[in-house]
Amino acid sequence: MSHILRAAVLAAVLLPFPALADQAGKSPAGVRYHGGDEIILQGFHWNVVREAPNDWYNILRQQASTIAADGFSAIWMPVPWRDFSSWTDGGKSGGGEGYFWHDFNKNGRYGSDAQLRQAAGALGGAGVKVLYDVVPNHMNRGYPDKEINLPAGQGFWRNDCADPGNYPNDCDDGDRFIGGESDLNTGHPQIYGMFRDELANLRSGYGAGGFRFDFVRGYAPERVDSWMSDSADSSFCVGELWKGPSEYPSWDWRNTASWQQIIKDWSDRAKCPVFDFALKERMQNGSVADWKHGLNGNPDPRWREVAVTFVDNHDTGYSPGQNGGQHHWALQDGLIRQAYAYILTSPGTPVVYWSHMYDWGYGDFIRQLIQVRRTAGVRADSAISFHSGYSGLVATVSGSQQTLVVALNSDLANPGQVASGSFSEAVNASNGQVRVWRSGSGDGGGNDGGEGGLVNVNFRCDNGVTQMGDSVYAVGNVSQLGNWSPASAVRLTDTSSYPTWKGSIALPDGQNVEWKCLIRNEADATLVRQWQSGGNNQVQAAAGASTSGSF
């Protein structure tokens, strides 16, 4: 596919940007956001099974190093379970995408079981967490010759109980999927255990670093928390709660609540981040200035940190190929750059849609924004302030390394109008409709030239042979290298010459630094597999300097 070759070439010529430590752990409120430093790529679009039938896993394997080099720390994979469904309606047709699966066999329309394992291994080896899409609410119960057979009348299905309407009944604690005939009773011990065991299998056998839970309006959020606790408690998770206030019955408190309140309540109960449909609704129905009303713009950091922001996905947006995909709630083209500039410079965990990144020409722009986010140290819970008195949206975002001033569709003349200190321009696109400035006189990664500024130093660790779920990190005697703490070490993400691992890390200019290579588990920082033996590596930080170690 030509776009893959082009992406690889672009990644090779772009300058490397500072890597940040891959933080593990839950939020202060116990939410599984894996440290709050993820940038996620949605690794498919709706028509993948028609555009690249039985070959998508191979494509992901081939592009693993490019995905890592582009700055993504995780990839949202398609549903891995077998789906041979098909449908036609008014001249349109589809099926096989995974959302009407019939068993847990991995030989499906994205590729084979072996190809999936190879793709997961390549992605994990490149330092990209694999997050599987999972669909516990419903399955294709009528498909013949499936490996999961659940008879009617034993409480396995929603319609085994009286079903008075589209709300919980005695065999289902959520909404129906379409008419409800295919809805599973996830509260039944056998059904609960079936999914618990499969999530554990995906983690142990297929490199899962987390899960995206589909259609969570169909089952209790507490069930998601239990599944994660029982099978993958230290992993990342996110729920898709696409249900506005007016869709709840009049007697439900959520009928008069805000989008933010509804999705935050789900996150509180599931202990997982949640897709920021509060922001998506404002993107669709409000002005750019209204984007501040997303969950990621909430004044409370406990709200911001659970927001998983996105512009479009396989459901809401267009896809290459047949019928343009689903496009149920697609953002207008004229706002796509502004939207990515916002989610990639603001709090929350951003998700980039595959087709925006690799099919439709936004890739260079998105790479630039990822570099800005990483260099500034913007995280899920970073502070954000909005400034009135200007057109469009104007915000100040406080990263751990730099402050960003963001102006979208705005008449703001310069960052000094809303923030003190010196700033340099980082992004200016769409005829000035997208502008981002960062504090300091340079990029924080090698172009400052001033005493005490940060400069990019090239790190290399040789002979870093790892198992699935582990990566090579640099750790050392400065805060940028974790002060010798493995939990705060910096993951090296360039594995194009595996088992050599490389990365560019921002260090204080002129600082004498001592450091070592180590191998540790990505999800559990306490699982250190190997330290580099011998004396410490040494380097004096200077722009473009190189340093290496070896196992």
UniProtKB/Swiss-Prot annotation:
InterPro entries: Alpha_amylase (IPR006046), AMT4_domain_C (IPR015165), Carb-bd-like_fold (IPR013784), CBM20 (IPR002044), Glyco_hydro_13_cat_dom (IPR006047), Glyco_hydro_b (IPR013780), Glycoside_hydrolase_SF (IPR017853), Ig-like_fold (IPR013783). Its cofactor is Ca(2+). Binds 2 calcium ions per subunit. It is found in: Secreted. The active site is at residues 214, 240. One of its GO terms (biological process) is starch catabolic process. Residues 1-21 form the signal peptide. GO terms for molecular function: alpha-amylase activity; glucan 1,4-alpha-maltotetraohydrolase activity; metal ion binding; starch binding. Disulfide bonds join 161-171, 237-272. The record marks 315 as: Transition state stabilizer. Its EC number is 3.2.1.60. Its main location: secreted. Residues 449-551 form the CBM20 domain. The keyword 4Fe-4S does not apply. Gene3D superfamilies: Glycosidases (3.20.20.80), Golgi alpha-mannosidase II (2.60.40.1180), Immunoglobulins (2.60.40.10). Keywords: Calcium, Carbohydrate metabolism, Disulfide bond, Glycosidase, Hydrolase, Metal-binding, Secreted, Signal. Ca(2+) 1 binds at residues 22-23, 34, 37-38. GO terms for cellular component: extracellular region. Pfam families: AMT4_dom_C, CBM_20. Belongs to the glycosyl hydrolase 13 family. Monomer. This is Glucan 1,4-alpha-maltotetraohydrolase. The lineage of its organism: Bacteria, Pseudomonadati, Pseudomonadota, Betaproteobacteria, Burkholderiales.
